[in-house]
Amino acid sequence: MKRHFGLILFSAWFLVAILHTFVTVSWLYWYYTWLDIPMHFSCAFLLMTTWFYFLNKKECLKELAKKPIFNPIFLLILIIISWEIFQLTLGKPMSSNYINDTRTDLVVGLIGGLLSYFFFSSRTIGK
């Protein structure tokens, strides 16, 4: 399992990308508004898992991870906020409850990323 983790991780990203593309092209995000929630959760989880995968592979990243700017939680929050700004600038149709939708996206993404963080941090940073 450990040997094939990179392939599993790549496959998970590929699956999420295919699913996201299908859901976007089919306008399913706008028909089933709840689809946004598992996508934000899974992408944040995969993002943090990918960070730890490369952290475990590269010794130099372990020192870098100790610097506040490269703290994985800080990076996660920065990427989640950047994604929301990206969606806004792309012209994603704004619903009447855009603020609540954005807040939910941020919280769900943070939960997904933190779940991965707490699972992998003791196995990677503490080594």
Q: Model segments located where?
A:
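Bulky hydrophobic segments
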Residues: 1-127
